Amino acid sequence: MNFHEYQSKQLLAEYGIPVPAGKVASTPDEAVEVANSLGKGPWMVKAQIHAGGRGKAGGVKFCKTTDDVKAAADKMLGTKMSTYQTAGVELPVNLVLVTTAGEIVKELYLSILVDRGTKTITYIASSEGGVEIEQVAAETPELIHSLNVDFVEGVQGYHGRDFGFKLGLNAKQAGQFASIMVNLYRLFNDKDLALVEINPLAILDDGNLYALDGKFDSDDNAAFRQKALVAMRDKTQEDETEVTASELDINYVTMDGNIGCMVNGAGLAMATMDVIKLNGGEPANFLDVGGGANKQRVIEAFKLILSSDKVEGIFVNIFGGIVRCDMIAEGIIAAVKEVGVKVPVVVRLEGTNVEEGKQLLRDSGMAIIPADNINDGAKKVVEAVKNAA
């Protein structure tokens, strides 16, 4: 789950990490009220969407007067915004964050994440903040520093001070940096986060460090014990079909192609998409119907796939271990009848009760195309889509 900047800053402040004073507003007049409550300007007005790169898209404005604040908020609120991170998708701007604005002396980068390669929690820091860390890694990798956290020792003050000096900070600032690192570690663990990125972590004209922007990503597997974080979810920022899928507990990700996929198991689902592409097709989605799939779940999966008008064919690829192929076949038949599927459907079944499942499909009288294996199925669905065009 992703978070808005203002939500990230609330959590950072809760854990003693300094952020500029600010508050969200939903109307231009509210934005002016917030600005006045923060004292004398200047101020920053920032559109709240689940994406970075807002500045280049006109979503971050420096304002010297309250008239500027009102004009900036009026221009942003109620619009839709896309950035280089949204892949052309426009996200609604329902809120703006109004904060105090100090003069930036230096921008740094700091993040904490789970490094699956080293199987540790890892810090990444750079003296080059305010830009994409991938760009820094490609052009000046020597400016990136990392620390793998020992689970027994945890993060200590000397780790942060050492990091701070590597980034060119003075003694006072290195001490602040150490405090931020220690508090960030507590936040990361307490809230079951997968990523916290502070970019930039800036030195302002008062000589102190502030988190000017924060990007959070939580571990959805821990949602059951992080009710406060779940309550922060903004579904207006998410793909509508993906929201519906999450409510049905179906793993679904929208993609750009025209061949819908219904598969059980994440690994098989990814392999299915790969084989479709190898055969000249483009998957329209990732959909893992799960190992405990039943008839109703299959029907709901078909509805999700066909909610996109881009889908011109469907490939059902099921390996029945826990799930029974005959039950999947019943679900496919029911779905085709109930949903009124008008695109080619290719089905590959293997595993438990596979012969019973295939017989049900044959006896259904429906134009369901059988496949012997994953490659055969991918070829047939790509061909069927081309022939139907």
Swiss-Prot record:
Belongs to the succinate/malate CoA ligase beta subunit family. Its EC number is 6.2.1.5. PANTHER family: SUCCINATE--COA LIGASE [GDP-FORMING] SUBUNIT BETA, MITOCHONDRIAL, SUCCINYL-COA SYNTHETASE BETA CHAIN. Keywords: ATP-binding, Ligase, Magnesium, Metal-binding, Nucleotide-binding, Tricarboxylic acid cycle. Substrate binds at N264, G321, I322, V323. Succinyl-CoA synthetase functions in the citric acid cycle (TCA), coupling the hydrolysis of succinyl-CoA to the synthesis of either ATP or GTP and thus represents the only step of substrate-level phosphorylation in the TCA. The beta subunit provides nucleotide specificity of the enzyme and binds the substrate succinate, while the binding sites for coenzyme A and phosphate are found in the alpha subunit. One of its GO terms (biological process) is succinyl-CoA metabolic process. GO terms for molecular function: ATP binding; magnesium ion binding; succinate-CoA ligase (ADP-forming) activity; succinate-CoA ligase (GDP-forming) activity. ATP binds at K46, G53, R54, G55, G102, E107. InterPro entries: ATP-grasp, ATP-grasp_succ-CoA_synth-type, ATP_grasp_subdomain_1, Succ-CoA_synthase_bsu_CS, SUCC_ACL_C, Succ_CoA_ligase-like_bsu, Succinyl-CoA_synth-like. The gene is sucC. Heterotetramer of two alpha and two beta subunits. Disulfide bonds: none annotated. Residues 9-244 form the ATP-grasp domain. It comes from Xanthomonas campestris pv. campestris (strain 8004). This is Succinate--CoA ligase [ADP-forming] subunit beta. Gene3D superfamilies: ATP-grasp fold, A domain (3.30.1490.20), ATP-grasp fold, B domain (3.30.470.20), Succinyl-CoA synthetase domains (3.40.50.261). The keyword Cell wall biogenesis/degradation does not apply. It is an enzyme of class 6 (ligase). Pfam families: ATP-grasp_2, Ligase_CoA. Binds 1 Mg(2+) ion per subunit. Mg(2+) binds at N199, D213. It catalyses: succinate + ATP + CoA = succinyl-CoA + ADP + phosphate; GTP + succinate + CoA = succinyl-CoA + GDP + phosphate. HAMAP family: Succ_CoA_beta.
